[in-house]
């Protein structure tokens, strides 16, 4: 396994040190992928750009979908929808409602995103802070809906 380090070559030689950015890059990558999975199933903006719940049409085992499958292993509903790869909204809407209301997969996904965002921001801080990365995290932030 390759360890990625970035030397600060612009610093005086006596202050030269290396920082390990792998944990930060891993956190950002995981956060972004889970966020993308959630947005694909919930965001009207994603629907405009990529189509409605395209991950279901493509049969993808996204983060909320995997949670929904594991939340009730006796119910094969989500697996059946993934196998059918529906192009029309009817089955997709039903599956999204199931993931939201029955398995609470979107709530779980939001909680994981909140935790990953906090870890990412802490890692940015540990590495000395970075206004540009903090701004990116602000832009990627997903509001957790109020629980009823």
Regions found by a protein language model. Give the residues of each.
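All-alpha prenyltransferase/terpene-synthase fold signal
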Residues: 1-148
